[in-house]
């Protein structure tokens, strides 16, 4: 036994015991690093109350926060992806699907629901980015078309929240075909004169941005959302030049006229309802009642990991 081990064995120092904090009660802001109470963050729709950073939000949480309580009906839930090409990169596609389905609880990357928004019938779709980066495959395209068909049947507006890395490479040309398929479906909305509002969230890239995500009668973005086709790193490597600060972010795009407006997530529900009421010649909606306040307990030690 070394001299230091003998000294340590004689010491009466007892290790500090961390507080017994349940898993998931606290989290950290992706931007400012502030320790946040999970319940308060959920109440604030995954927007940091300290720096206003808009974190990524699950598809079902988006739709539940948008549509009136008790009005939601899911569409296209029976559609499931198939590994038609028997595709394999470093891992089999069917195994990637199984992992994504287990981790997210979703069958694919797009969730579609119909319901009411301040009493007005609407159809809404939202991407689940945690499902293979929100990539667009055959099921995503089919569900989006189902959303359009339902909006046409109900003679109501369509809203889509995009959060995607683009077309799903594991489905090759079948995924690229969804760009044309979804765009053609939206042409029917235009013929009928029904509003389609596209909400661009972080990130909206690739084949999704090159198709239905940018085809809204109104294209609304969340603050600081990354929106484009190729990513900034790929562009820099290609052109061999440093890109401007904030390139491809929503604030940059609105300056260039590529999008129509930027709306903070907590204000989005009322903003969408107000716009659609105007477009559908309906009475203006009243503001929602304030959400019930959350009592935030003392912040734990900074070295505690949620």
Swiss-Prot record:
This is Acetyl-coenzyme A carboxylase carboxyl transferase subunit beta. Transmembrane segments: none annotated. A zinc finger (C4-type) spans 29-51. It comes from Cronobacter sakazakii (strain ATCC BAA-894) (Enterobacter sakazakii). The gene is accD. Residues 25-294 form the CoA carboxyltransferase N-terminal domain. The keyword Lipid metabolism applies. Coiled coil: none annotated. Its EC number is 2.1.3.15. Belongs to the AccD/PCCB family. Pathway: Lipid metabolism; malonyl-CoA biosynthesis; malonyl-CoA from acetyl-CoA: step 1/1. Residues 286-306 are annotated as: Disordered. InterPro entries: AcCoA_carboxyl_beta, Acetyl_CoA_COase_Trfase_b_su, ClpP/crotonase-like_dom_sf, COA_CT_N, Znf-ACC. Binds 1 zinc ion per subunit. GO terms for cellular component: acetate CoA-transferase complex. The lineage of its organism: Bacteria, Pseudomonadati, Pseudomonadota, Gammaproteobacteria, Enterobacterales. Keywords: ATP-binding, Cytoplasm, Fatty acid biosynthesis, Fatty acid metabolism, Lipid biosynthesis, Lipid metabolism, Metal-binding, Nucleotide-binding, Transferase, Zinc, Zinc-finger. Pfam families: Carboxyl_trans, Zn_ribbon_ACC. One of its GO terms (molecular function) is zinc ion binding. It is found in: Cytoplasm.
